[in-house]
């Protein structure tokens, strides 16, 4: 076991605080409408330019191990805020730094760290309750646009795109962010249910100019197994040919003789058929086939429930208004499924989302909900260079998470005003069990001004003057750093999601409280490289002797 380096008391806290300040100072320059960029060097490729707090925090590793421990703990604050609300990482870092700095001053003055921590926890709990009282629902398209704009660092086009996307696919819908091909940002909405499986043979194509298969009013045959024998398919094919409608086969796979016969029939015009693989794998494939069945009022032909493909009839087939297939995707538009059954299925999947503990599973289940409920929106981010594209995608991603958080828990006045108002409201009535807890309460409430002060500092103004003016105001009165004007923050469109502000404060206080109560730090002693080199050199000499 390696030898350890141990530091106690003030020595440990000074080192830890230095690490906290290095990381927080790097992150906080990005805060607010006039926040600056940070350039991150990469081991290969061009450097990344970002205004995303958590991206900056993740890059920072310090050489001194004690300082690095402090930095890593603040990094945890940014990561947790990002995981919980998808935004507010810089605010969380600024709050953590302010609470740790104030707290360690009090500890150095001889206060009891545990009582300070209890005071901080009381203040945070009271302010979180007050934030919920200040919160108002985020319902209109305009409010959603404003939240998106603020989170994308005052990029109004991003705010508009997110608002339009939510209008098209609903607030629960899936909105994804992809690289665009031009310079402009675009919104692409996929109506109906789309899954990432294309046609099994290019000979099915009936629209050569777009290289797609288009089927109008088709039947859909859903099969939970591989089809390789054409005899199994003949009864269904004959029924569909008599009905004079096209057929889409969705199965685990269609291969060999079965696929060849379908292609020949299609080319001769005997029956219009296309085949695609079923989406997903394993249990997820079964579930997605069932989703398609409910959407199109069909039945999944599965041997697990005693159904055989040879005995399938037209009643077992689903129907839709239109199906479009290209080499990568299949889109089913306007399935004839019963509305009540579709809603029941959506409710069932939502229940699974509630119970799931895996983020990946939740994401996949959310996608299924969106596909059943009516569509997926894709925001295509345009930029002149790849470096700009990465930076912009980060901002769009943040804005998307922030708007979701706003829809979930509502909005409060932005620009750090909500924390100042909530802190002022609880300051008069909140009391600790002893004087040291009261000091903890006061230092936490004072630290809650830090985001407002940092936004103002980044805008090149005097933080104390603005903070004093905002504190003397009432309600949503605050300072718009973008236009350098005072006024009603909500009317000016400067909004923050309540969830983002709440999460930032809770995570910052949690980690800051642990750091204030730290009395000892332990790390590995660095290895003595010189000794290792000496030993290696001696070995070399011995080798030379052998050669003599």
UniProtKB/Swiss-Prot annotation:
One Pfam family named in its UniProt record: Cpn60_TCP1
GO cellular component, one term: cytoplasm
Binding site for ATP: 30-33, 51, 87-91, 415, 496
PROSITE patterns: CHAPERONINS_CPN60
MF term (GO), any: ATP binding
EC assignment: 5.6.1.7
Location relative to the cell: Cytoplasm
Swiss-Prot/TrEMBL catalytic activity: ATP + H2O + a folded polypeptide = ADP + phosphate + an unfolded polypeptide
InterPro entries listed in its UniProt record: Chaperonin_Cpn60_CS (IPR018370), Cpn60/GroEL (IPR001844), Cpn60/GroEL/TCP-1 (IPR002423), GroEL-like_apical_dom_sf (IPR027409), GROEL-like_equatorial_sf (IPR027413), TCP-1-like_intermed_sf (IPR027410)
Alphabetized CDD domains for the sequence: GroEL (cd03344)
Key words of the record: ATP-binding, Chaperone, Cytoplasm, Isomerase, Nucleotide-binding
Gene Ontology biological process terms in this record: protein refolding
Enzyme class: isomerase
Family: Belongs to the chaperonin (HSP60) family.
Its biological purpose: Together with its co-chaperonin GroES, plays an essential role in assisting protein folding. The GroEL-GroES system forms a nano-cage that allows encapsulation of the non-native substrate proteins and provides a physical environment optimized to promote and accelerate protein folding.
Subunit and partners: Forms a cylinder of 14 subunits composed of two heptameric rings stacked back-to-back. Interacts with the co-chaperonin GroES.
Protein name listed in UniProt: Chaperonin GroEL
């Amino acid at each position: 076991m390696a030898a350890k380096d141990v530091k106690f008391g003030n020595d440990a806290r000074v080192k830890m605080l230095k690490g906290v300040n290095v990381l927080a100072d790097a992150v906080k320059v990005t805060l607010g409408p006039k926040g600056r960029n940070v350039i991150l060097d990469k081991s290969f490729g061009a450097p990344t330019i970002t205004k995303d707090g958590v991206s900056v925090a993740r890059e920072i590793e310090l050489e001194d191990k004690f300082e690095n421990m402090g930095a890593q703990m603040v990094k945890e604050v940014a990561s947790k805020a990002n995981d919980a609300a998808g935004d507010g990482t810089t605010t969380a870092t600024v709050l953590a730094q302010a609470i740790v700095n104030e707290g360690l001053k009090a500890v150095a003055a001889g206060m009891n760290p545990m009582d300070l921590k209890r005071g901080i926890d009381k203040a945070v709990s009271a302010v979180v309750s007050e934030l919920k009282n200040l919160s108002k629902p985020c319902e209109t398209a305009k409010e959603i646009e404003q939240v998106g704009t603020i989170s994308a660092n005052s990029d109004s086009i991003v705010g508009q795109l997110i608002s339009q996307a939510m209008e098209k696919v609903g607030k629960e819908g899936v909105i994804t962010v992809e690289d665009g091909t031009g310079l402009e940002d675009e919104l692409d909405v996929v109506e109906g249910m789309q899954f990432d499986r294309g046609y099994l043979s290019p000979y099915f194509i009936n629209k050569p100019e777009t290289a797609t298969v288009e089927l109008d009013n088709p039947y859909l045959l859903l099969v939970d197994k591989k089809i390789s024998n054409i005899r199994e398919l003949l009864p269904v094919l004959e029924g569909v040919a008599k009905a004079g409608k096209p057929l889409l086969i969705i199965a685990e796979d269609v291969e060999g003789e079965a696929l060849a016969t379908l292609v020949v029939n299609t080319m001769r015009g005997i029956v219009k058929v296309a085949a695609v693989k079923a989406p997903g794998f394993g249990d997820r494939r079964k579930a997605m086939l069932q989703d398609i069945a409910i959407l199109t009022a069909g039945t999944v032909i599965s041997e697990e429930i005693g159904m055989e493909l040879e005995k399938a009839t037209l009643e077992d087939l689903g129907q839709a208004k239109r199906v479009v297939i290209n080499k990568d995707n299949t889109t089913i538009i306007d399935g004839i499924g019963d509305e009540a059954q579709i809603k029941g299925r959506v409710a069932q999947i939502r229940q699974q989302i509630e119970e799931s503990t895996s983020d990946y599973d939740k994401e996949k289940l959310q996608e299924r909900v969106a596909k059943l409920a009516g569509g997926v929106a894709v925001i295509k981010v345009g930029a002149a260079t790849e470096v700009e594209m990465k930076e912009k995608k980060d901002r769009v991603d943040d804005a998307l998470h922030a708007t979701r958080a706003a829809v979930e828990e509502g909005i409060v006045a932005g620009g750090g005003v909500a924390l100042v108002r909530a802190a002022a409201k609880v300051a008069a009535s909140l009391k600790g069990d002893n004087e040291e807890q009261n000091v903890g309460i006061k230092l936490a409430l004072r630290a809650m001004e830090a985001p407002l002060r940092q936004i103002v500092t980044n805008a090149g103004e005097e933080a104390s003057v603005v903070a004093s003016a905002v504190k003397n105001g009432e309600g949503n009165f605050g300072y718009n750093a973008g236009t350098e004007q005072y006024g009603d923050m909500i009317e000016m469109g400067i909004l923050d999601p309540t969830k983002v502000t709440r999460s930032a404060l809770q995570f910052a206080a949690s980690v800051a409280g642990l750091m204030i109560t730290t009395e000892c730090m332990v790390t590995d002693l660095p290895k003595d490289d010189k000794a290792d080199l000496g030993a290696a050199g001696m070995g070399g000499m011995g080798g030379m002797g052998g050669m003599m």
